[in-house]
Amino acid sequence: MQSTANYLWHTDDLLGQGATASVYKARNKKSGELVAVKVFNTTSYLRPREVQVREFEVLRKLNHQNIVKLFAVEETGGSRQKVLVMEYCSSGSLLSVLESPENAFGLPEDEFLVVLRCVVAGMNHLRENGIVHRDIKPGNIMRLVGEEGQSIYKLTDFGAARELDDDEKFVSVYGTEEYLHPDMYERAVLRKPQQKAFGVTVDLWSIGVTLYHAATGSLPFIPFGGPRRNKEIMYRITTEKPAGAIAGAQRRENGPLEWSYTLPITCQLSLGLQSQLVPILANILEVEQAKCWGFDQFFAETSDILQRVVVHVFSLSQAVLHHIYIHAHNTIAIFQEAVHKQTSVAPRHQEYLFEGHLCVLEPSVSAQHIAHTTASSPLTLFSTAIPKGLAFRDPALDVPKFVPKVDLQADYNTAKGVLGAGYQALRLARALLDGQELMFRGLHWVMEVLQATCRRTLEVARTSLLYLSSSLGTERFSSVAGTPEIQELKAAAELRSRLRTLAEVLSRCSQNITETQESLSSLNRELVKSRDQVHEDRSIQQIQCCLDKMNFIYKQFKKSRMRPGLGYNEEQIHKLDKVNFSHLAKRLLQVFQEECVQKYQASLVTHGKRMRVVHETRNHLRLVGCSVAACNTEAQGVQESLSKLLEELSHQLLQDRAKGAQASPPPIAPYPSPTRKDLLLHMQELCEGMKLLASDLLDNNRIIERLNRVPAPPDV
């Protein structure tokens, strides 16, 4: 045990160790509160006095939630070594998070954004206080879990930090070589003499490498054999990097340098976030200081990302989930353009559903009016795009092979790589199942909308047909129309014949809609059956079971690698563990390929066929709806003409009757008196009936107009 006046710790509770100090987990003697103590060794006292006290002075100036707090500076009892008492971060460092096999291909998007927010806030506080850190790397970013379960990242280890204004330079070299600015790397690692001075932007390069590492799980610049074994090529990669490139690698010995301008496909970040992040990385991983961004622009651009909101959009036709990053104050038009950029679906062709309901977005309205979405509850984009599906790299391509002999360190590294690929397979399997669920749900919603359209259009058609049938079936009209001597009645008979034709068209439309309803119901039953099969899928559980067993063996390898060697029996167990581990990995990848990928690809093909049927059905319903509307419009016109004709005929008969009553002696009537009287009565009743029918047809037309206001998709 060691102690100071107020704190004590056991030397076994080592948290980290460097060239000049060791960090231990300690406790407050009075309260029992856990803290971290940094105990400086004898080597640290060989440094100049100014350098020794610099870390204390820097930490005393800082007070921010994203920087590890300094509680006290004390001394050990016997040797009187200086001790920094600091905030204890119980969840390790960002490096330990990235070293976990679950994060072998980088952090999930939400966690990466937390890292970005914390690092930017912490660096901004340093800059406000005129301090350059000079050793930014994942190992110097500590993690703490907050009360609500969220991660909080804090900058630590200010042993290399010093006060420096924007226009000042320094010449001393600090830092960890993989994260060093190329100019500092040349001097510190390659030991090449140079007269260059360094400014505050050296931290930007280190931040760029750190962010790339957090996003992908690997370093951006990798020479053949690794950065520590091939230092000259490492320097070449960083200094010869073309503008816009964010990574470089040498795949084989003496091979060419290959450049990357995008993040790898294995990265967990969405394309929406990648499109915002890549330009930042390209401009801070810039060796020429004249071209490299300054802190002001870096803070402005990263703050722009962090201030954006995410709208989750599932392109139903493409079967792809998109993350659209926009500002809350942006208009819907800007949102639609962002969707267009990722999906290639033009704004005028974008239709949205949310939780089963049509979601009409007005371009001029603020994006704040968009419903809150999540990855499992996104806006569903309906368009005529061709299915693409989730793009991914087969995890089997990233599975390393065990060496035949027993090599504890090599076996551990291999197991770690295989386990990382296994976790990637698990993530992809979940994404494939989630994608199928979103396909089924979106298709079900679209078919529900089409069924509702069928019901409304059918109601309009049947109502119009009922009115027409009622009018055409009246005996009074038949008796009146049977009087051929009156020319107007011949015209009325022709109009009546046209109404009969329209009634036949409406009848066919009604039958057509009924058949469409049956077709949609059949497709929906098929969809429910497919959805149930996906819900019964147990591939995720099988993969997880393999991973749990592999994890147990991996932990055994992790313990063994620290030992100098194994006894005979232990070595035999180790060999069996390697065999079992390989079998489990093979089984895991087999389940992924046969139960996940193949079923997903088959589902994608079926989805494409169903989408074509849905688009054809929708276009067909539009045509039927137009036919019903046209019939209603024409029937309304015919009814109005018929009503006007009968009204004129009724008026003429009234005039003839009045003239006949005044004449003496009464002339011989062209028609028998009873017929004239009945005819007049029938005309008046028919006029009223025609007016009512025309009014009903007008109401139907208004209903159809409202139906047609729903935006229509482009023609297939």
Curated annotation (Swiss-Prot):
Record has DNA damage as a keyword: yes
Region (Leucine-zipper): 436-457
Main location: cytoplasm
Source species: Homo sapiens
Record GO cellular component, one term: PML body
Glycyl lysine isopeptide (Lys-Gly) (interchain with G-Cter in ubiquitin) crosslink residues: 30, 401
Phosphothreonine modifications at: 501
Protein's recorded name: Inhibitor of nuclear factor kappa-B kinase subunit epsilon
Annotated active site: 135
One Gene Ontology biological process: intrinsic apoptotic signaling pathway in response to DNA damage
Localization per record: Cytoplasm; Nucleus; Nucleus, PML body
Domain Protein kinase: residue ranges: 9-315
Region (Interaction with DDX3X): 383-647
Effect annotated for changing residue 168 to A: Slight decrease of kinase activity
Phylogenetic classification of the source organism: Eukaryota, Metazoa, Chordata, Craniata, Vertebrata
Annotated consequence of substituting residue 172 to A: Loss of autophosphorylation and of kinase activity
Tissue expression notes: Highly expressed in spleen followed by thymus, peripheral blood leukocytes, pancreas, placenta. Weakly expressed in lung, kidney, prostate, ovary and colon.
Phenotype upon changing residue 231 to R: Loss of sumoylation and loss of targeting to nuclear bodies
Gene Ontology MF term list: ATP binding; identical protein binding; IkappaB kinase activity; K48-linked polyubiquitin modification-dependent protein binding; protein phosphatase binding; protein serine/threonine kinase activity; ubiquitin protein ligase binding
E.C. designation(s): 2.7.11.10
Entries under SMART domains matching the protein: S_TKc
Induction pattern: Induced by lipopolysaccharide (LPS) and TNFA.
The protein's assembly and partners: Homodimer. Interacts with MAVS/IPS1. Interacts (via protein kinase domain) with TTLL12 (via N-terminus); the interaction prevents MAVS binding to IKBKE. Interacts with the adapter proteins AZI2/NAP1, TANK and TBKBP1/SINTBAD. Interacts with SIKE1. Interacts with TICAM1/TRIF, IRF3 and RIGI; interactions are disrupted by the interaction between IKBKE and SIKE1. Interacts with TOPORS; induced by DNA damage. Interacts with CYLD. Interacts (when polyubiquitinated) with IKBKB, IKBKG and MYD88. Interacts with IFIH1. Interacts with DDX3X; the interaction may be induced upon virus infection. (Microbial infection) Interacts (via Protein kinase domain) with arenavirus protein N; the interaction inhibits IKBKE kinase function.
